[in-house]
Amino acid sequence: MSYLDHCGVYVKDLENSLAFYKEIFGWKEKTRWTSGEAKIAVLDMGKGLMELVQRPGSPGAPPGGNWTHLAIHVNDFTDKVRKLEEKGLELRKVTMGEGAHIAFFKDPDGHTVEIMEKGLSL
């Protein structure tokens, strides 16, 4: 069976992005390395990995990028919303059919992130 192993995103400031995702989601840093001028760190999300890549001139979320958003299933939706609001982030909250709650926000690099109580795979 095939599955998604990790997603990789460009970031402007590796340390800032690591701190953001660790604080909001409690993810742990799995490893980090350099490749040429690139600094790379991998976060363990529990059921998959997120690779953060900082290169000289990394744009963060490129205008008109090739992906729309990163969707993250959380067990503590209300707590995550509270943490994000405390950080001053603007949230777009939506209630889907059957009472599933989701919220969209921008991470420090402008990537659209979705948090959800019930994932598509559940």
Regions found by a protein language model. Give the residues of each.
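Residue-level marker for the onset of beta-strands and adjacent loop->beta junctions
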Residues: 5, 39, 68, 99-101
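Amphipathic alpha-helical segments
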Residues: 13-28
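Conserved short beta-strand elements that form part of the metal-binding/catalytic scaffold
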Residues: 28-64, 112-119
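N-terminal beta-strand motif that seeds the catalytic metal site of vicinal oxygen chelate
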Residues: 1-15, 67-72, 119-122
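Residues at or immediately preceding the N-termini of alpha-helices
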Residues: 14, 77-78
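Short amphipathic alpha-helices within nucleic acid-binding modules
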Residues: 20, 78-83
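Vicinal oxygen chelate
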Residues: 30, 42, 81-122
